[in-house]
């Protein structure tokens, strides 16, 4: 298993309850240790990724599972026109481009097992169809975060389409409003979130590839 952003609260709760017989590797922007992680690789979202660079890290390792936990919501205190383009691109790169590019490189390097399950943490806030249709999604602000998740969803949909003739399962996943320090509230405990994710990993099959699923296994409109 390979995970990105192991330091997030949801990731740490997941790791705390993970089967210890599973070899877990992680990618983060700083040193990180967890008893369940065999090795952590420091790779920043600003790094120039390439097939060769990741080949030097992972060699011939083949992963059965990949989970990108990148998904912390950053509340924008300024209006869109007040935020510098450099900052906007940084958020897009971290939330959207970076995790997908990692997967593209790993696929090119044959670092996934044939029926690997690849999960990208996204957010319902990134649903274009649902924007403004529900109380939570009718709130103003946080435009860049929402747009970054919409971009991620588009990447995931395309990635799944490009791998439709393989056994790989690729989904976008909304864990719901989990009670973490960064969420500012929530209605799902960390322990419940861990159980939800474990069930998703266990149950998803090829028929789910290319879909945007929530923690109750319902499909969210793009």
What are these regions (language model features)?
Residues 3-4, 62-73, 95, 120-122, ...:
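Rossmann-fold scaffold of SDR-type NAD(P)-dependent oxidoreductases
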Residues 126-128, 155, 160-188:
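Flexible, glycine-rich beta-alpha linker
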Residues 168, 172-173, 184-222:
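C-terminal helical subdomain
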Residues 15, 55, 103, 156, ...:
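Short-chain dehydrogenase/reductase
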Residues 72-102, 107, 115-164:
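Catalytic loop of short-chain dehydrogenase/reductase
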Residues 2-20:
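N-terminal Rossmann NAD(P)H-binding glycine-rich loop of SDR-like oxidoreductase domains
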Residues 29-50:
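Rossmann-fold cofactor-recognition segment
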Residues 6-9, 25-33:
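Short, polar loop motifs at secondary-structure junctions
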């Amino acid at each position: 298993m390979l995970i990105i952003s192991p330091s997030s609260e949801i990731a740490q709760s997941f790791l705390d309850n993970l089967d210890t017989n599973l070899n877990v590797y992680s990618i983060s922007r700083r040193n990180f240790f967890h008893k369940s992680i065999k090795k952590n690789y420091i790779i920043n979202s600003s790094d120039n990724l390439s097939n060769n660079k990741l080949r030097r890290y992972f060699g011939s390792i083949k992963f059965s599972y990949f989970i990108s936990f990148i998904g912390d919501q950053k509340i924008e205190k300024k209006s869109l026109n007040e935020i510098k383009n450099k900052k906007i691109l940084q958020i897009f790169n971290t939330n959207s481009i970076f995790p997908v590019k990692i997967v593209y490189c790993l696929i090119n390097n044959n670092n996934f097992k044939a029926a690997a399950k690849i999960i990208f943490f996204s957010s319902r806030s990134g649903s274009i169809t649902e924007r403004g249709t529900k109380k939570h999604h009718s709130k103003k602000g946080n435009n860049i975060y929402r747009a970054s998740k919409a971009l991620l969803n588009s990447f995931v949909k395309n990635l799944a389409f490009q791998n439709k003739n393989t056994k790989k399962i690729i989904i976008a996943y909304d864990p719901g409003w989990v009670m973490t320090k960064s969420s500012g509230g929530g209605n799902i405990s960390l322990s419940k979130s861990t159980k939800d994710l474990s069930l998703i990993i266990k149950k998803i099959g090829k028929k789910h590839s290319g879909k945007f699923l929530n923690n109750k296994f319902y499909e969210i409109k793009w």
